[in-house]
Amino acid sequence: MDWLLLAKAAIMGIVEGLTEFFPISSTGHLIVVGDLINFDDRIGNVFEVVIQLGAILAVCWEYRARLWQVAIDLPTSTMARKFVLNLLIAFLPAAIVGVLLIKTIKSYLFNPVAVACALVVGGLVILWAERRECTARVHRIDDMSHLDALKVGLAQIASLIPGTSRSGSTIIGGMLFGLDRRVATEFSFFLAIPIMFAATAYDVLKHWELFTAADLPTFGTGFLFAFLSAFVAVRGLIRFVASHTFNVFAWYRIVFGLIILGSWWLGWINWAS
């Protein structure tokens, strides 16, 4: 058994779990950290699918009571049907654009330099959004209209650019469109479920032949650490947004992005391709 590979898998799982739901871009961090620790490119695409599944199942577990109640009430409750329809409406824009452009995006933007630029720009957008005086008008997820959901879904399109952050685009977009901080954050969590399951299913079908029994320990390690770290991150973020802004994440993005760009410019790394 390759213990070094398992250690790298654990690191990648932790990175995925901690960054998937914080507005700092999980894809961007996986690209950068994967390059730094020289993670096995042979299983890279498949491994990312596995750890994303671990992260999203952590959300399902955290909100299992709410999800179960919605499933039970769906045939009879207008509110439950509205909630599901809002998720579908918010899911579709990024899903459609993603299907059309994913090959182009992966060809040109899946590199650490592009990620660094997106990190910096995204950080500046968060700082700008936090400084705007915007009165929240939606204080419960159940009060969101279909138009609110569509606006969040359109904001999610930006997350197709690696380094932007799916959670960042949906949370900040939701706040700009009138959702309060907690509602925007929780709706982002729920919206992650269909978008990430769809992405996972697509990648599984595309890379099915790369799943081998020999790699199960690596996959299992990454999955476990992604699940546990995502569970901690989701709970922590909900408590955090109750009394804090997202400025700390914005500054982290900016500093991290500038470090990457500076390292590349000085020739310390060769990550442009």
Curated annotation (Swiss-Prot):
It comes from the Bacteria. It holds the Pfam family BacA. It is a multi-pass membrane protein. One of its GO terms (biological process) is cell wall organization. The keyword Manganese does not apply. It is found in: Cell inner membrane. GO terms for molecular function: undecaprenyl-diphosphatase activity. It catalyses: di-trans,octa-cis-undecaprenyl diphosphate + H2O = di-trans,octa-cis-undecaprenyl phosphate + phosphate + H(+). InterPro entries: UppP. Its EC number is 3.6.1.27. It is an enzyme of class 3 (hydrolase). One of its GO terms (cellular component) is plasma membrane. Its main location: membrane. The chain crosses the membrane at residues 43-63, 82-102, 109-129, 185-205, 214-234, 249-269. Keywords: Antibiotic resistance, Cell inner membrane, Cell membrane, Cell shape, Cell wall biogenesis/degradation, Hydrolase, Membrane, Peptidoglycan synthesis, Transmembrane, Transmembrane helix. Belongs to the UppP family. Bacitracin is thought to be involved in the inhibition of peptidoglycan synthesis by sequestering undecaprenyl diphosphate, thereby reducing the pool of lipid carrier available. Catalyzes the dephosphorylation of undecaprenyl diphosphate (UPP). Confers resistance to bacitracin. This is Undecaprenyl-diphosphatase. It comes from Laribacter hongkongensis (strain HLHK9).
